Amino acid sequence: MLKAESSGERTTLRSASPHRNAYRTEFQALKSTFDKPKPDGEQKTKEGEGSQQSRGRKYGSNVNRIKNLFMQMGMEPNENAAIIAKTRGKGRPSSPQKRMKPKEFVEKTDGSVVKLESSVSERISRFDTMHDGPSYAKFTETRKMFERSGHESGQNNRHSPKKEKAGEAEPQDEWGGSKSNRGSSDSLDSLSPRTEAVSPTVSQLSAVFENSESPGAITPGKAENSNYSVTGHYPLNLPSVTVTNLDTFGRLKDSNSRPSSNKQATDTEEPEKSEAVPVPEVAQKGTSLASLPSEERQLSTEAEDVTAQPDTPDSTDKDSPGEPSAESQAMPKSNTLSRPKEPLEDAEANVVGSEAEQPQRRDLTGGGDLTSPDASASSCGKEVPEDSNSFEGSHVYMHSDYNVYRVRSRYNSDWGETGTEQDEGDDSDENNYYQPDMEYSEIVGLPQEEEIPANRKIKFSCAPIKVFNTYSNEDYDRRNDDVDPVAASAEYELEKRVEKLELFPVELEKDEDGLGISIIGMGVGADAGLEKLGIFVKTVTEGGAAQRDGRIQVNDQIVEVDGISLVGVTQNFAATVLRNTKGNVRFVIGREKPGQVSEVAQLISQTLEQERRQRELLERHYAQYDADDDETGEYATDEEEDEVGPILPGGDMAIEVFELPENEDMFSPSDLDTSKLSHKFKELQIKHAVTEAEIQKLKTKLQAAENEKVRWELEKNQLQQNIEENKERMVKLESYWIEAQTLCHTVNEHLKETQSQYQALEKKYNKAKKLIKDFQQKELDFIRRQEVERKKLEEVEKAHLVEVQGLQVRIRDLEAEVFRLLKQNGTQVNNNNNIFERRPSPGEVSKGDTMENVEVKQTSCQDGLSQDLNEAVPETERLDSKALKTRAQLSVKNRRQRPTRTRLYDSVSSTDGEDSLERKNFTFNDDFSPSSTSSADLSGLGAEPKTPGLSQSLALSSDESLDMIDDEILDDGQSPKHTQSQSRAVHEWSVQQVSHWLVGLSLDQYVSEFSAQNISGEQLLQLDGNKLKALGMTSSQDRALVKKKLKEMKMSLEKARKAQEKMEKQREKLRRKEQEQMQRKSKKSEKMTSTTEQP
């Protein structure tokens, strides 16, 4: 709740700034409108508004009280007494720094303010004869505070409350606005302390005194407030004369608003006074005024009615819509002693009227003996939350704080005798009003110096130093450029925050229900009350002006109202500005931009939730105690409500239990006079009231214990529910943990399987590497053996060549011998010539003709010549080797596998070896003569079948090793059909062969796409990654496999092409050699023929 703070104290906390000066100027303009009289002549209460609105958070009464007590701690009793007399002024000027006390006060519906009477506690305080330092200073300071508030209470306005029904409680805001501005009243963030409970005892005690005593000691025109309740502690052995001076709390009581008797006895009440609304009060059993004599009760009622008549013109009850009403707590000021011997009949003169009342009051003030009863609801009255629509009401029972501050002091047993002198001394200046402008305090002066220097020319005074509370008429303009504006001015921060908001104007028409919004000031709270976040819309009243307009929403910031900025102001200031608006109201609303996290919205929602919970608790609280009151029947009648203060059970109650002394001797009524009998009766009433209070306190404690028990049961149930939830959560977590364990076991199993597979693959890989090495070694061995065989063949060919040459030489020798023999035999020369002529060439002579001619013509040497000729090989045609070559190539092609590097090398080398051997053999045959062809043919026929056999063994060995590797490494081996389909070159493959190749690679899913695109061998070799993706091969592993195979095939084709080119070159060389040999042979044959023809 916002608390009051004097502007003088505020200026000591925060220095002035240009922003603050601007706001103060605006508020002064508002204040001037409050002070103007209304057109109908009703005067607005200037003092009631607590001077100007002090910007900043208000401090409560406790702060000021404690501060003032500390200031008085070190003062002497005589100095304190002097201060009390000096600081009372004659007038009531309103200081611009006068504090506003939002405490309780009372008003009448006709506009007059009740003048309250002095309380018993104040009368008792005058008999303090033991002036003991700090305790006396505290007590006198408290009295001074009672007197100080006299000029501030009379003009404050307040609505009369009604009894709040259970379930319908609505806490009223601090500023009780009228119906027209109810919608714009500022919302409070905490419950009003008016709903707290106070002790029922003191109100019952004061009700006892109120029955028969006269309200004579009343000063006209005075109505004073106090922020503090003071309870004294008194000795237990009280003499019977002074029992009536027991401490009690003063209560606010409107004596002119009684429902029955005051309307008949009062002649000067104004006609516009509204009908009284009875407030139900808890009456204590046995203390009803009905038990008193009717004369005394009528006398007390009439006497109290007359009390407030002269005070009627002091103030009016009209509540201006723009003026916040403060709650104040009135304490009595006039102090008189009651003397038991004064007859009660003197009080009847008060019934006559105000003319006879004034002299009697002067008499009672100067030396009156009657005790002035105090209405005891000032601190313990039952506070009922106000209905904002309620203007009428007769009684106002309010208090602002349930804490009771006790001022402790010691008393002598004879305080009743010495108190009269102080009473008279204090009453002498009772009509002097306290003037806050003249307030000062004295502090201890300089100590006496023991030795004063002789040459000192000045002298220091040792008198007490007076410290006056000064007020500045002009704000101190601080021009300090070194101060950081961000750190020194909260307004600067707020203006920076407003710049980030989305601002838009809104105009509302204020109707009879107000603006339809409630505001809340969101702030940090440690910086003299400036709302660090600004003034925000807390709620929007259903059906109000703001809801009908629809533009203002909850959590919006009110930046400006009718040109008055609400940036950096207090909630009270904002509420005052809103209440002062009329007609068409212009707003500037700030709203946070979309997407931002609003801390204000969170705070407001938390505040609303807290208020809702507190309201529910309060409703249950009232419902519970209303039920208790209905059961026990402790409600008082309408007649008793005026004398007995309302009591709100529950809460912390400061119950003072007085153990009154009882005389052992019982006096008869004849031995006692009327005053003693009255005193004895009051003593018994007090005892009864105390007993009732104790019973009520025990009931309250019992109810609190039951509530605590219920709360414990709820907590126990909540804890049990939490335990069950935790158990369920633990079961869930345990199930999750078990699932995680099983998952870990599964993953471990998979890992072990993967490791075993990896080890198996590694073994296969090592075995394959070993086989490859073995194969390479065998290949090297085969090459070496082949080289050795080739050398052997060359040596054999050389031996054959030498042998052939020897044979040719021998043949020539034999032919020469034959020719010689023929010459010798002249008879056969012609026959030999005919034979040579008939034969055109040596190849045309057949074997049979030669042999016949030889047998016919031969003579003596015929047998030897025929033997030589038979040894010679007859000349035959050269054998055709093309058939053998074709046969060898076909045998190789039939066993042809995929063109791997080793197989291609084997096939090429075997073919080369074959051709070279054939060609060499036939070259030899070309050089042979007709007689040597048989040997050449034999050598050629013997070498030719040998070479294909070697190549076949090589191919077989290669096939076996590669098949073993395929079986070891590949998961799916190549089928014979697949191998046969690839016997052709890759670029010659058809679409079907490409499909077979894909099936061999376990890529069956892509066969349809390849077939649809008609991918042949040439297109297959041209495929890359993008084309494979286009063909639907999305798997990167499949694409990598196909690319790898295509790369290997391309490399194999390139090597085959190079080998083919090499073979072509070798064949070309062989052809050239054959041609050269043919030329040589032809030349040799020509030479031979020429030589044979010459002889």
From Swiss-Prot:
Region (Interaction with TGN38): 598-1091
Domain PDZ: 505-593
Pfam families (UniProt xref): PDZ, PDZ_5, SAM_2
Single GO term (MF): transmembrane transporter binding
Feature: compositional bias, Basic and acidic residues: 1-12, 33-49, 140-151, 1050-1079
GO cellular component assignments: actin cytoskeleton; cortical actin cytoskeleton; cytoplasm; cytoskeleton; dendrite; dendritic spine; dendritic spine neck; filopodium
Tissue expr: Brain, and widely expressed in neural tissue. Highly concentrated in synapses of developed neurons. In developing neurons, concentrated in the lamellipodia of the growth cone.
GO biological process, one term: cellular response to toxic substance
The keyword Methyltransferase is annotated on this UniProt entry: no
Effect of mutating S461E: 35-fold decrease in inhibition of PP1-alpha
Positions where Phosphothreonine occurs in the chain: T312
Residue(s) carrying Phosphoserine: S192, S338, S372, S461, S841, S916, S929, S957, S958, S961, S975
Region of interest called Disordered, as start-end residue ranges on this chain: 1-65, 85-111, 125-394, 874-953, 1050-1095
UniProt-listed CDD domains: PDZ_neurabin-like (cd06790), SAM_Neurabin-like (cd09512)
Location(s) in or outside the cell: Cytoplasm, Cytoskeleton; Synapse, Synaptosome
Boundaries of every SAM domain copy: 989-1052
Stored InterPro entries: Neurabin-1/2_PDZ, Neurabin-like, PDZ, PDZ_sf, SAM, SAM/pointed_sf
Compositional bias segments (type: Polar residues): 178-214, 326-338, 922-937
Keyword annotations: Actin-binding, Coiled coil, Cytoplasm, Cytoskeleton, Developmental protein, Differentiation, Neurogenesis, Phosphoprotein, Synapse, Synaptosome
Subunit structure: Possibly exists as a homodimer, homotrimer or a homotetramer. Interacts with F-actin, protein phosphatase 1 (PP1), neurabin-2, TGN38 and p70-S6K.
Task performed by this protein: Binds to actin filaments (F-actin) and shows cross-linking activity. Binds along the sides of the F-actin. May be involved in neurite formation. Inhibits protein phosphatase 1-alpha activity. May play an important role in linking the actin cytoskeleton to the plasma membrane at the synaptic junction.
Protein name, as recorded: Neurabin-1
Organism whose genome encodes this protein: Rattus norvegicus (Rat)
Protein's gene: Ppp1r9a
